[in-house]
Amino acid sequence: MRADGVVAYNMPQGEERGPEVDLFDFTYDGKVTETYLSGGLGQLMDGVEGNSNFRFDPDNSGRKGYDWVGWRNDSAAAAAGDVRRRRPPIRIVFQFDRVRNFSAVWFHSNNLFSKDIRAFRKAVLYFSVGPPTAGYQSRPVVYEYMRDRVIEFARNVIIPIPHRIGRTVRADLYFDAKWLMISEVRFESGT
């Protein structure tokens, strides 16, 4: 079991970015369908942060982008800049071994904006003391990320969530570009 108590996460499967780069969660050990992952753990929890250059192949395995899971905001409305009609946020639901008292969550995000990749523009975090089907507390944490237009390095986006308790955390990550890429997620919590 992981030190932060995550026992599973559920989310949409990553997507292909051209013929050479697959941004899938290749190591996911739960139920895998063509478009959705549930009941397991994978690359978002493997302890490996992806390189800023998502095409980097550190072990020469032929898998460019291997350390990243990515999703495309491919609607025509998004390309035209119509925020109201963009793809819905990427929803990741994390399940923990027991009820925890959280202090922060870290998302290692890519920000290679010259390639249409940015960290999420907003994250909304919901907490539940029960399973994902039990419903969430009424006060989510809303975090607005300040867009970085200068530095293209991948970075940890750290969201403070002091004194929030839960056994399930739902993170809705909102697109700020054509692509959203995450390579690692880490929670800080106590019991």
What do the predicted segments below correspond to?
Residues 13-16, 24-25, 29, 39, ...:
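Trp- and acidic/polar-enriched beta-sheet ligand-binding modules for extracellular glycan
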Residues 101-106:
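Contiguous beta-strand segments within globular domains
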